[in-house]
């Protein structure tokens, strides 16, 4: 679990290191607030994604299942600044094995609530679904704005990073890949 006391001390030390007074009125409760926030935004470190996966048998369904625009918030592990965006998650069931739609969003949420790289997050989502459901294919696309590019360094607000992970038929079959990418990119 997260050591909130250690976080509080570290935040207090950071405030002092940047020349602030951690005992002034506006900052007095900041270490506690940050510790509670970290417990929430890093909850995925202590949650097994396999615990939320529930598989249903739907023998008649053999077409692409896509959930688009799943909101995600994660923390870039390089600067501990947020990246915020959406995930599009699609898969093609094998032998009618399907996940509940909300489970796709839960998988995204759990894996995003860790210090992350967008590239790794995209792959972890795809690999988790491949392992859990053994579908014919999985496609995951994430579009996100990284505050480490917005607030510091290059300072380019609005720049979006797009990553994709394709598994199974979506990687090997051009026609299937084109179909799923067309669905993901459609504006409707």
Curated annotation (Swiss-Prot):
The keyword Hydrolase applies. Belongs to the GTP cyclohydrolase I family. InterPro entries: GTP-CH-I_C/QueF, GTP-CH-I_N, GTP_CycHdrlase_I, GTP_CycHdrlase_I_CS, GTP_CycHdrlase_I_dom. One of its GO terms (biological process) is one-carbon metabolic process. Its EC number is 3.5.4.16. This is GTP cyclohydrolase 1. One of its GO terms (cellular component) is cytoplasm. Zn(2+) binds at residues 76, 79, 148. It comes from the Bacteria. Keywords: GTP-binding, Hydrolase, Metal-binding, Nucleotide-binding, One-carbon metabolism, Zinc. It is an enzyme of class 3 (hydrolase). Homomer. It catalyses: GTP + H2O = 7,8-dihydroneopterin 3'-triphosphate + formate + H(+). HAMAP family: FolE. GO terms for molecular function: GTP binding; GTP cyclohydrolase I activity; zinc ion binding. Pathway: Cofactor biosynthesis; 7,8-dihydroneopterin triphosphate biosynthesis; 7,8-dihydroneopterin triphosphate from GTP: step 1/1.
């Amino acid at each position: 679990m997260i050591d909130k006391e250690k976080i509080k001390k570290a935040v207090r030390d950071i405030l002092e290191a940047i020349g602030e007074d951690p005992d002034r009125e506006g900052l007095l409760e900041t270490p506690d607030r940050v510790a509670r926030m970290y417990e929430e935004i890093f909850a995925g470190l202590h949650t097994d994604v396999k615990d939320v996966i529930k598989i249903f048998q739907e023998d008649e369904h053999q077409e692409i299942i896509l959930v688009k625009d799943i909101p995600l918030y994660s923390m870039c592990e390089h600067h501990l600044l947020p990246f915020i965006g959406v995930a599009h998650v699609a898969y093609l069931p094998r032998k009618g094995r399907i996940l509940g739609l909300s489970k796709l969003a839960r998988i995204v949420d759990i894996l995003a609530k860790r210090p992350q790289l967008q590239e790794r997050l995209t792959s972890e989502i795809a690999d988790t679904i491949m392992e859990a459901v053994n579908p014919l294919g999985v496609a995951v696309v994430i579009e996100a704005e990284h505050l480490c590019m917005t607030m510091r360094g290059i300072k380019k607000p609005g720049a979006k990073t797009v990553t994709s992970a394709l598994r199974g038929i979506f990687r090997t079959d051009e026609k299937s890949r084109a179909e799923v990418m067309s669905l993901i990119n459609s504006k409707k």
